[in-house]
Amino acid sequence: MARRYDSADSKRRITSACVRLFIEKGYHGTKMTDILSAADVSSGTFQNIFHTKDGVLEELVHFMFAGQFGAAKNMIHISNEVGIDLQNDPVLLYAVETSIQLTLAELNENLREVYVEAYTQAKIAEMIYRKTAGELYKIFSPYLPGLTESDFYELEIGTAGIMRGYMSRPCDMYFPLKKKLGCFLSLALSAYKVPEEKQAQIQKYIASADMTAIANTVMQELFRALAMRFEFTLSN
């Protein structure tokens, strides 16, 4: 019993230390020596549980993606100016959620690293594809009625690649955030055959919304949720 307890406690301390360090120092900036010191475990203990820090990243990404659509829904505000039912429109929900992801990457370089690494690593990317495919099927099947959830999995590989590409390229004066969001949504919504009139309504809403303020609120809530889930306190 003691060995099982120690193993569970070591895993808890490792995940807590890793997630905190990923947020504070970035995924690539977090060295194995940092993790071992913060978690107070040996390299052998770490390797027995996770092998590499990629294993902890997978747990972190799973948690982050699990609540992303709920977070986006909470950020949608009612407006009569764009001509769509903002509270009950799944396409808008998708647009807000993906726009929040892209904006988070601009607000915090360490989150950018986490997202880009997640879309880059084959095992973690596969998890994202499979989790997202079901949501995409629910959202976009009215526009692509002949497709199965498996078909949406294949489309998600492409749109996730677009997401990764835009995330990895920081905004600047020549490619500001609003333009990045507009480009991504145009490509993604076209891939899912959303009618042009509907796309224009969605684009108008996103362009008029303060996505930086919305994403900043989501980021603070995310950090609080991560601190609670993985039992750590962020440095000031």
Residues covered by each model-derived region:
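The short coil/loop that forms the "turn" connecting the two helices of the helix-turn-helix
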Residues: 9-10, 41
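An amphipathic alpha-helix adjacent to DNA-recognition modules
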Residues: 11-16, 28-29, 49-73, 77
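Pre-recognition alpha-helix immediately N-terminal to the DNA-recognition helix
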Residues: 13-21, 100
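Helix-turn-helix
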Residues: 21, 25-55, 59
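Hydrophobic alpha-helical connector segments
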Residues: 59, 73-111, 131
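Amphipathic alpha-helical packing segments from all-alpha helical-bundle domains
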Residues: 72, 96, 116-168, 179-186
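Short, hydrophobic secondary-structure boundary micro-motifs
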Residues: 112-117, 198-201
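C-terminal peripheral helix-coil segments that are non-catalytic and often amphipathic
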Residues: 138, 142, 168, 172-236
